[in-house]
UniProtKB/Swiss-Prot annotation:
Domain of life: Bacteria
Annotated HAMAP family: Ribosomal_uS13 (MF_01315)
SUPFAM superfamilies: S13-like H2TH domain
GO MF, one example: structural constituent of ribosome
UniProt KW Transcription keyword: no
Coiled coil regions, renumbered to chain: none
Source lineage: Bacteria, Pseudomonadati, Verrucomicrobiota, Methylacidiphilae, Methylacidiphilales
Function: Located at the top of the head of the 30S subunit, it contacts several helices of the 16S rRNA. In the 70S ribosome it contacts the 23S rRNA (bridge B1a) and protein L5 of the 50S subunit (bridge B1b), connecting the 2 subunits; these bridges are implicated in subunit movement. Contacts the tRNAs in the A and P-sites.
Statement: the UniProt record of this protein carries the keyword tRNA-binding: yes
Entry GO terms, CC: cytosol; small ribosomal subunit
Protein family membership: Belongs to the universal ribosomal protein uS13 family.
One record GO biological process: translation
Protein name: Small ribosomal subunit protein uS13
Key words, A-Z: Ribonucleoprotein, Ribosomal protein, RNA-binding, rRNA-binding, tRNA-binding
Amino acid sequence: MARILGVEIPGNKPLISALPVIYGIGRSRAKLICEQAELNPQMRAKDLTNQQINRIIQVIEENGFVVEGDLRREIQQNIKRLQSIRCYRGIRHIRGLPVRGQRTSTNARTRKGPRKTIGVVRRKEAKKGKV
């Protein structure tokens, strides 16, 4: 298994499928990295030499791709900024509701979490069968 930018790349996969394991690199960026590093996209990650790994890292840094921890931190800071200025999107993040205008009267279960069932309190007489 090759280690690129602190991430273990699965060795049995081709580069075009293995590079997207890195957070911030998708299939199109993986293809671009392979072209610029002059590597065959179908080459297995386990067959990479140290020189080729260094070339991949160099291409990622030269293009200014923000990946892994830096990207996660940047996204988190953007959300915190929205929350601190109390804009609509920030308030939606705070309340745990959909941010991009989706409906919430029904659906939105992923964002809202599982349903919270609310029980009904009944009078003691109603339990005994008396009205």
